[in-house]
Amino acid sequence: MKNRLRVLRAERDWTQEDLANRLGVSRQAIIAIEKEKYDPSLPLAFKVAQLFGKRIEDIFDPENEG
């Protein structure tokens, strides 16, 4: 699914490792989500939204599949 994770991360000057540590996941998971190879679980999507202060649908777009 399309997402804005890479853009939001870059706006904060965070590396993939920084974001992974903040979310409690592996860097490989962040890479896979950013490349749209992996859709995050609902709990992880909520954590991402909370971390960036946005709604899930503002970050992840299930209507616009990759």
Question: Where do the model's predicted regions map?
Answer:
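Short, basic-rich loop-to-helix N-cap that marks the start of a DNA-contacting helix
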Residues: 37-50
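Short, charged recognition helix plus adjacent turn
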Residues: 50, 60-66
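Recognition helix of helix-turn-helix/homeodomain-like DNA-binding domains
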Residues: 25-38
